[in-house]
Amino acid sequence: MTMKIFNVMSVVLVLLSGISTGVGADPLDTLMKKFEEGKYSKKGADTCIMCHKRSDKVMAIFDSVHGQANSKSPMAGLQCEACHGPQGKHKGKNEPMVTFGESSPLTAEMQNSVCTACHNDTSRVAWHTSLHAEQDVSCVSCHQLHVTKDPVLVKDQLVEVCSECHISAKADMNKRSSHPLKWGDMTCSDCHNPHGSMSDSALNEIDVNQTCFECHAEKRGPFLWEHAPVMENCANCHDAHGSVNEALLKSRVPMLCKQCHANDGHAGTAPGDNSSIQTGGQGCLNCHGQIHGSNHPSGKAFQF
């Protein structure tokens, strides 16, 4: 725990030291000086509680994981000051301190450095190159600290937290066909790592297909006859977050199929027959039922 506290203060000091003077710099300069002096309260959290006990939001920390009396909690070390910085000379609202949220004098990167000094396991190793970090999203943009249950860690509340920013994805999951997120059978984190990953779109797996195969294993193969678009990317045909078409398809069959298979005639279609996609009554899947791949003797026709 001592090493974690040292890491927190070291990271914050480095970030603060890079701040240039200018508008709003004075509080940060004062805060950096407090870190350099390292004057922490002699009574720890007891000093803070003397005034802040009137605030339910502050006292709720003791119902959260951060307020538990164990070796992994800030309460085992510098307590409140482990996150909020040294407050040995705290004189009320005018005294600069490490705070979190939009009203904080610290940038999102500085705020996050306090959290990542302790929360630095392998699931967060790609945070600094993640889209969230690049967009200056802070940890508290998603997480709530002084609460018994952080909503983002509760399965049936996670989707709502993500949807506050990802509005288009929320709209998609209410379309005709979608993954069962709105019923609580899935969450966004089943496919995505919000803390970043080495894959596109912060996927948990190496690519789109491997992510899909985690649930749709029957589509993985290997197949004797493979369908190239399927093996390349499931997203060639499907909208993962939802679609107005059945089976999450980007467009209806046969229009979807015709994007690759040009309308230049088809075996078994008599000359003069109506070959229109819209009015010809074409149904590709009537014959080509194993479109994800097949081991059937019919070969690349992908039949049953």
Question: Regions from the language model: what does each represent?
Answer:
Residues G22-F304:
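Short sequence/structural segments immediately N-terminal
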Residues M9-G18:
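Bacterial N-terminal signal peptides
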